[in-house]
């Protein structure tokens, strides 16, 4: 009678609905998750489709957990203490650093606001972003190239679409500072994985904080599990 659909990329077409004659209610998590449901077919078949509010806050929290862990060397220090050691390095403060926000929407805005509390300068870019839209948030609107060149950390908050696949590729990664971090709590395909792994392996960028992956769970031998400059959390 009721189906709860959790994964937004799992399509729910007419053919599936027609095989469920008792189905009366189809639930999806998050507003965007209804996009892959055949809404016209649901209406015709008398199936009610309902979605929950998107949980932006949890993604914002995970984003900042990763940013802070990277800058402060959290995993290395905790690991050292657990092994009987003590301080291994010096954490880096956020005050005066530049955070690049790729996508200043429902998640990018609170991420930017928290950065400003820490004393960071926030710059942002997305394909349709304008200075008029960034000014109320005290965020500098910049070009895509400037964002990758100037940022000490870059966090991704754009939706997965044909236009955003591979938005961060070899060229963009080559523009990043040697010690800069890339944080992705958005969608994995926004970043071209092969040059990304190469940049992390060669340490041409400082590291990454990741909560989304092309394959979930990650294979045991995947670089995102093994590279010392990557913090991966299980989405």
Region locations from a protein language model:
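Glycine-rich NAD(P)-binding loop of Rossmann-like domains
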Residues: 77-110, 137-140, 144
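C-terminal helix-to-coil terminal segments
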Residues: 51-62, 214-234
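Short, Asp-centered acidic motifs that coordinate Mg2+ and/or phosphate
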Residues: 1-2, 25, 153, 181, ...
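Hydrophobic Val/Ile/Leu positions in short beta-strands of Rossmann-like dinucleotide-binding domains
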Residues: 28, 99-101, 124
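Phosphate/diphosphate ligand-binding glycine-rich loop within oxidoreductases
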Residues: 2-78, 92
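A short helix->loop->beta-strand "cap" motif at the edges of active sites that frequently abuts
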Residues: 20-25, 45-48, 120, 178-180, ...
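Rossmann-like adenosine-cofactor binding region
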Residues: 11-13, 128-223
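Phosphate-coordination loops involved in phosphoryl transfer and adenosine-cofactor binding
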Residues: 23, 95-99, 170, 179
């Amino acid at each position: 009678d009721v189906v709860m659909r959790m994964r937004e990329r799992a399509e729910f077409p007419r053919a599936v609905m027609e095989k469920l004659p008792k189905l009366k209610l189809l639930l999806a998590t998050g507003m965007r998750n209804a996009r892959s449901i055949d809404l016209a077919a649901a209406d015709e078949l008398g199936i009610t489709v309902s979605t929950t509010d998107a949980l932006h806050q949890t993604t914002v929290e995970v984003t900042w957990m990763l940013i802070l862990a990277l800058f402060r060397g959290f995993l290395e220090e905790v690991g050292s203490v657990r092994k009987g050691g003590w301080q291994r390095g010096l954490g880096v403060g956020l005050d005066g650093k530049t955070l690049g926000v790729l996508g200043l929407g429902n998640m990018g805005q609170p991420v930017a606001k928290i950065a400003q509390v820490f004393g960071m300068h926030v710059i942002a870019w997305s394909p349709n972003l304008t200075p008029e839209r960034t000014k109320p948030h005290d965020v500098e609107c910049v070009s895509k190239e400037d964002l990758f060149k100037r940022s000490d950390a870059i966090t991704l908050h754009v939706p997965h679409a044909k236009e955003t696949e591979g938005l961060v590729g070899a060229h963009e990664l080559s523009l990043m500072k040697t010690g800069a971090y890339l944080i992705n709590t958005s969608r994995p395909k926004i970043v071209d994985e092969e040059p990304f792994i190469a940049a992390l392996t060669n340490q041409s960028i400082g590291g990454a904080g990741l909560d989304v992956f092309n394959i979930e769970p990650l294979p045991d031998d995947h670089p995102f599990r093994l590279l010392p400059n990557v913090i991966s959390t299980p989405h």
